[in-house]
Amino acid sequence: MLQPKRTKFRKVHKGRNTGLAHRGSTVSFGSIAIKATERGRMTARQIEAARRTISRRIKRGGKIFIRVFPDKPITEKPLEVRMGNGKGNVEYWVCEIKPGKILYEIEGVNEDLAREAFALAAAKLPFKTTIVTRTVM
């Protein structure tokens, strides 16, 4: 599972996921990519599940680039615990996703196979996505 090796602070505020993704919104490493069209959160488990789905579909064909990393800790209080008495313990890590963010890229496989793999991976994600290709200028 992906998570930071060390962080400056153990717990963070909830915050708001607003705006569009300007950084990480172009295909940089591969030839075809999957891009988020809605905002949401992607847990480390979801990142890994989608990665495994893509890699199983393309087998040994190409290279997968993961463009997201879960760097935000999410806390939960134990069951049947009264409110108050501080913030809960860190349970899992998420990555805040804004519309336009590139999630995964593939290089070295034909486009049909890559689209198939991304379609399977999109079913594992909690928001709508689209498939984009690199534009050469």
Curated annotation (Swiss-Prot):
GO terms for biological process: translation. The lineage of its organism: Bacteria, Pseudomonadati, Pseudomonadota, Gammaproteobacteria, Moraxellales. The gene is rplP. Gene3D superfamilies: Ribosomal protein L10e/L16. Keywords: Ribonucleoprotein, Ribosomal protein, RNA-binding, rRNA-binding, tRNA-binding. Belongs to the universal ribosomal protein uL16 family. Part of the 50S ribosomal subunit. This is Large ribosomal subunit protein uL16. It comes from the Bacteria. SUPFAM superfamilies: Ribosomal protein L16p/L10e. The keyword ATP-binding does not apply. It holds the Pfam family Ribosomal_L16. NCBIfam families: rplP_bact. GO terms for molecular function: rRNA binding; structural constituent of ribosome; tRNA binding. GO terms for cellular component: cytosolic large ribosomal subunit. PROSITE patterns: RIBOSOMAL_L16_2 (PS00701). Binds 23S rRNA and is also seen to make contacts with the A and possibly P site tRNAs.
